[in-house]
């Protein structure tokens, strides 16, 4: 898939905006690769500090993802010093890349940390919760279920023993956790403003990407699925750009 997850067992976390440092190690020196960022066709100029980059050699495609989620570290396998998988967010299991084990070894279960995720939802690194790499994870609530949006992938959260507020049904929410017994879900509002022109594929003055993710009452839809010619800003609860 040209918009999906990268096939890779290694990742690079960018140290600066528009940086290609470290990418050549993934691509074996090739520079003629295609770039996708958060599931959308992009370019090196759109890359940002702390983006996680992986590489699919078959399609010669670089995948960048900026999803960062602040979590309470619940458990891991087989050990905190070299975890291959961890559980966070109410028992949700995330696989850990070999290249991420060193940064994860700085944390032990019972602590909070911010995970940097690849475009397919694998852990590429872990950092302290600070301004330089603050969590930005968002998801969609559908009934009692919550899906974390990661690149062009959605990840079902386990939320074991937790109850989702029915008032959040169908809403886009921010996601974070600082304790074993709860996950913070807060409705997102605002963001990019403007009316959605379905026919022209624009939001205000901005052109929508072909792989734009749209949610209508919590259901993922394509732009072509919308029957309205336009959707006024008053009916759009939240929108953001890939930048």
Label each region the model flagged.
Residues 1-243:
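...the same signal can extend to comparable exposed beta-sheet modules
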